[in-house]
Design a protein with these regions (language model features):
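Surface-exposed loop/turn positions within WD40 beta-propeller blades
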Residues: 4, 13-14, 24, 47, ...
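A short beta-strand motif characteristic of beta-propeller blades
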Residues: 26-33, 71-78, 117-124, 159-164
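Anionic-ligand binding region
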Residues: 96-133
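C-terminal closing repeat unit and adjoining cap/tail of repeat-based domains
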Residues: 148-172
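Short loop/turn segments that connect beta-strands within beta-propeller blades
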Residues: 21-25, 67-71, 109-114, 154-159
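Beta-rich, blade/repeat-based domains predominating
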Residues: 1-7, 11, 33-63, 76-94, ...
Length: 172
């Protein structure tokens, strides 16, 4: 949900981020960018800056975008693996992005303007892909393991805390 209290949704088929007005249920285009591959997951910081993962599943590549209050998309990072899950640490200073096919999770520092720097590997797995991610208030990262049917919990230091097995295999 954005600072106006409206829901934002990635519309990967039409290269959009959509906004759903929670009062009227009206759907409008929040941001359209022809250079989007297939915007997939999004997260929003306390200032209302939107970060979007943008995979190209066929080519197994991806990008990261930032969308500011002007609703214009700015490419933050190209030439990545298949970007999918994306989330911010509770203080908004670290952006986590996973690459589903390559099974890597990256961490980036985030400045006040929403620019990213200091790209580093946060975690790597040898099997099964990823989908959505979210941080808890302590900064632990919860990562869905698509095809395995688990959610892993990783500490802010990158240590595996727990792996929770679910009933279904295609966890997102």
């Amino acid at each position: 949900f954005n600072t106006a209290g409206n829901m934002l949704v990635a519309d990967f088929a039409a290269h959009n981020i959509l906004e759903v007005n929670t009062s009227t249920k009206e759907v409008s285009i929040y941001c359209h960018e022809e250079l989007f591959n297939q915007p997939n997951d999004i997260c929003i910081n306390k200032k209302g800056i939107v970060f979007a993962s943008d995979p190209n599943w066929q080519k197994q590549t991806g990008q990261i975008w930032r969308i500011g209050s002007d609703r214009k998309a700015v490419l933050l990072k190209a030439d990545m693996g298949t970007t999918n899950g994306i989330c911010l640490s509770p203080d908004g200073k670290i952006l986590y992005v996973n690459e589903s096919v390559q099974r890597r999770i990256w961490a980036f520092d985030v400045d006040e303007k929403g620019d990213i720097s200091n790209q580093r590997i946060f975690a790597v797995f040898n099997d099964f892909g990823f989908d959505g991610m979210k941080c808890d208030l302590r900064g632990n990262l919860y990562v869905t393991r698509y095809g395995k049917g688990t959610v892993v919990i990783i500490s802010p230091q990158g240590k595996l805390i727990q792996e929770i097995t679910l009933k279904g295999k295609d966890v997102s």
